[in-house]
A protein has these predicted regions:
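Helix-loop-helix
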Residues: 2-251
Length: 251
């Protein structure tokens, strides 16, 4: 079980990093390209400018601007997601052979691991494929958070009932962020038999998302909600219409 948590390590790391982020624009220096470091200059400022551009183009709505930027970010990582999908399909196809390896070498874990890796290489299965979309999104999500709290237009912007730079006073966004995270994990775990053994770990994420969303600027859980819905819809189109095996998994 522990060996299978590697896939979620990047997300856990990101959540812990974000936990240390402040919610006040005074916690950070202003966005000045002349004095900005590499990450600020090439990630935070362009993302802040992109949010400003879309907001100014659609009636000064930063809530909708975040939606557009979310879609752009998800489209950027879509090729990696498709690669992950293909690897996941291959993983499902080799499950019977993996079961035979586990049974044959049940008393020799090292040999079992060696034979499993040979099987992965033979069928082009990459067990790390699930990490890549998360790893790509990590710097973008960190940049998005700082773009929000360091951009005075976004920080003070009113969208629906909340100010995007402050926590949701009614906890609606934390609940929605946690709920969509739960649904996303549930939908994705149904596609991979290995994930079913990880449900107890995966269900921790919605709780973490809820707790952190209560203190984060509302724009970040709003991004999570948009991104989770995108993932749920994407998973349906990738897996939902696939033929099923006897075990109920996509073939």
């Amino acid at each position: 079980l522990i060996r299978r948590t590697y896939k979620y390590a990047p997300l856990l790391l990101l959540l812990f990093v974000l936990t240390g982020c402040g919610t006040s624009p005074t916690s950070y220096p202003p966005l000045d390209p002349a004095t900005a470091g590499f990450f600020t200059k090439y990630f935070i400022i362009p993302l802040s400018d992109l949010l400003d551009f879309f907001a100014n183009s659609i009636g000064n709505s930063y809530g909708i601007s975040i939606l557009i930027v979310t879609i752009i970010i998800r489209l950027i990582v879509l090729p990696l997601t498709l690669k992950q999908y293909k690897s996941s399909k291959r993983m499902q196809e080799v499950q019977p052979e993996m079961a035979k390896i586990r049974e044959k070498f049940k008393d020799n874990p090292q040999k079992q691991q060696e034979e499993t890796m040979k099987l992965f290489q033979k069928h082009g299965v990459n067990p790390l494929a699930g990490c890549f979309p998360i790893l790509i999104q990590m710097p973008i999500l960190l940049a998005l958070y700082q773009a929000i709290v360091r951009n005075p237009h976004i920080f003070s912007h009113q969208f629906l009932w909340m100010e995007l730079g402050k926590p949701d006073p009614f906890y609606v966004l934390p609940v929605l962020a946690a709920a969509t995270t739960f649904i996303q994990q549930k939908v994705m775990s149904a596609q991979n038999p290995m994930n079913k053994q990880m449900q107890s770990i995966m269900f921790i994420f919605p709780v973490m998302i809820f707790v952190m969303s209560m203190s984060f600027a509302s724009a970040l859980p709003l991004y999570w909600i948009y991104s989770n819905i995108f993932t749920i819809v994407q998973t349906y189109f990738l897996y939902g219409r696939s033929p099923k095996t006897k075990g109920g998994q996509a073939a």
